[in-house]
Amino acid sequence: MSSLLLLHGLGANGRVWDAWPQPRVAPDLPGHGSAPGLPSYTFGSMAAAVARTLPVRRNVVIVGHSLGGVIALELAGGGYDVDVDRVIALGVKVSWPADDLGRAKALAQKPVAWFDSRDEAAARFLKVSGLHGLVDPADPVVDHGLRQVDEHWRLAMDPGTFAVGAPDMAKLIADSRAEVVLARGERDPMNTDDELRALHDQVVTLPGLGHNAQVEDPEAVAALLR
């Protein structure tokens, strides 16, 4: 069983890693894909839910994208009976102005949106997950991110996940028992080189790639493990 754990970002699901070139475990985060939701979402509650599903708990290496990167760091803090050797946190948003947090909270409070067609629901999934233009609407990751009830469609994602909040990255990195690398695509609008370097001394920028670097060029991200 692989000890490589891949954690997706907000709005996506584990199928986003299908093109990854190495053996791995790629679960759905709570409230995404087929994973059960939680009464409320914090980085700790999400990490605990992920930890309970892991088939391997020792010498784990984690690549986490965006929200998944934060969950990876939370797991690396040692509070979940998971021995993490290394974390690559990719594309994590580290600056959270009040306006951004307010918008996220408002989204979390909205009711589930229903659509009359799969096409409409797929378009919404691709927008929410940041995969528009990168993934075909017919891709399995889209199917896994949708639910059909009778003749209507919705996202599998629990809107409450938007309320997970802003991570204390400095504390997460300081508390990590694992080696930590902060990585970003050169064109990622969610963060900057300077923001990451202010937090940590191991920063890698992937040339020409954007926020979903793991989808744009899985090999380039996988190379960070070598």
Predicted regions and their residues:
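Conserved alpha/beta-hydrolase catalytic His-Asp/Glu region
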Residues: 116-169
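Conserved serine/cysteine hydrolase catalytic core
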Residues: 148-199, 205
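Conserved HGGG/HGGXW glycine-rich cap/lid loop of the alpha/beta-hydrolase fold
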Residues: 1-36
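Gly/Ala-rich beta-loop-alpha elbow adjacent to hydrolase catalytic centers
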Residues: 64-68, 72
